């Protein structure tokens, strides 16, 4: 790779070091070799990018690295462009902000930083979350079957959702009171909404009837305000997925799933299913089914489970 840079007349000597001038990009020069001829991070990243393209012929080469490394990746991409590689534009820096904590795991609120020694291991966070979730389950529903499994699904999911709900480039504070809140814009809230939907469907024996349900009979159903709002939100799912993927922004999906959960709960509270005419009951069961299915798919894309009971 160094030889290629030399052959393309891209290396310039500066104070005994070898650099690539990036003035045309409005960037400081990229340090390729130190004065003792040792390599740098960007040297190794250039070589790695070349190897990945050769071995995998990637369509996108995505670097998920903290915002603080923005300049580094701007220089990396600029050097690849200077080397004449059009695929340099397919190298994407997906940056993210910092996390501070308010918890006895660290004892103080501080930015997580390996260099400063302010570190929590992810396994410790996940184990703590599962432990706290099990305590909540024992307080609220101690008779729940498989509660240890549910605690794991909800506890781990809560941490994932908290991370992905926040816009990725923004710093945020990790607080157990928010993460494990069953009533806020959280993973447990969304998972509980899906469990509620499953309970309704199970009580009405919906899953055994679904294959014989004549959906065409529901086409002329006149929806009320809450039903229509939920249907409109569900209809946006495909566009939300495309937008989230295009922008490398999982928070778009996480916030959308939360919106659907809120609208479903509003529908649940205002639109009774039992003791209704058959057409009304069938429509509301189908809408409940679609809501749960959407939440389950959405959470799955975020790496979360969807418990049937909570």
Language model features: what each stretch is:
Residues 1-310:
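Non-catalytic interaction-recognition regions
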